[in-house]
Amino acid sequence: MYKRQVIRCWHSTDVAACPGSGKTTVLLAKLKLLADKMPLEKGAGICVLSHTNVAVDEIKNRLSDYADRLLNYPNYIGTIQSFIDRFVTMPYLRNISGQNVQVVDSLTYAQHMLSKMQHEAKYKALDYVTRSNFETGGQFSDRINHTQALHIRGDGALCIGKQKKPLAGVGKASAGQYKELLAELLKDEGIIRYQDAYVYASVAIDELPAEYTDLFSSRFQYVFIDEYQDCNNLQRQAIDVIFDPQKCAVFKIGDSDQAIYNSAEDTTPDWMPQPDFLPIVTSCRFNQEIANVICKLKKSEKNIVTLAGATGVKPV
């Protein structure tokens, strides 16, 4: 009953699943139904987003019989981060830098930074401060590793690694030169670090014009976000800004009891489905005796109803 309700729903909604509920199978069923309706009106497509390449590959492999209809333009199936990078962050960076931008590893980036610090007079203060800290600190084997550890703290101070004492305060020349150096590497050499992509994505999302976001809601008539409980703050913000649930059907599919936490510092709140969400509370993963124990640990009040028979061993 629960799965049928989700499969038959074609308007924006949250779908709250439970472990072993077969939500991926439900998603695939909806996609196959859409494939039979293609091409959609006005040349619109579908967008399917998940968190990992493994999950995306699984979806693509299980849709192989429908590849000609689902895996090509105007449809998009990929990770949430790749979607944000392709359609939000990179267009924004091309606009402000005037060239295609490449994301490089921190070692390569540090090599470019150090070269400019050592050879360009406008970074004299930054070179002096960082060289002095490297020579007296004794924590790093070479200046490349030392340069990789440089960062601007939340208050604007220039810091190194996890040291609490900054190398330079927010008003110091070296802190300002560090910011100028990062901006120059983007504008002149077209490179950023992986860690910078997150920051630029946040800025790009905030500056997205309404006309641009309207294009997404027009191009993608149906949007599916799998494992939504694992979305971080930036990804949730991007999805809410890019896709208008009044103009296209947005399905946020997840299980708040199976969220993956990236670190102790992660401030992303637990996902709480909207009050009118559709539940999938039937599970094939375990027996009812085990489900009854698991229910006591769940965040939601919905019980899990299993489709398996009784077990001969009661849970402890």
For each predicted feature, which ranges?
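Alpha-helical scaffold elements adjacent to nucleotide-binding pockets in ATP/GTP-utilizing enzyme cores
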Residues: K30, E58-L63, F83-F87, Y200, ...
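Conserved RecA-like helicase ATPase core segment
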Residues: Q237-T311
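DNA-processing P-loop NTPase/helicase core
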Residues: C18, R86, P91-V129
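Accessory N-terminal region flanking or inserted into the helicase ATPase core
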Residues: K3-P19, T25-V26, G45-C47, K122-F224, ...
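Conserved catalytic network of the ASCE P-loop NTPase/AAA+ motor domain
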Residues: M38-E41, R69, D214-F216, I242-Q246, ...
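P-loop NTPase Walker
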Residues: K3-N95
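Walker B catalytic acidic pair
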Residues: E227
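Conserved RecA-like ASCE P-loop NTPase motor core of nucleic-acid helicases/translocases
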Residues: K42-V56, N75-I77, I253, I280-T282, ...
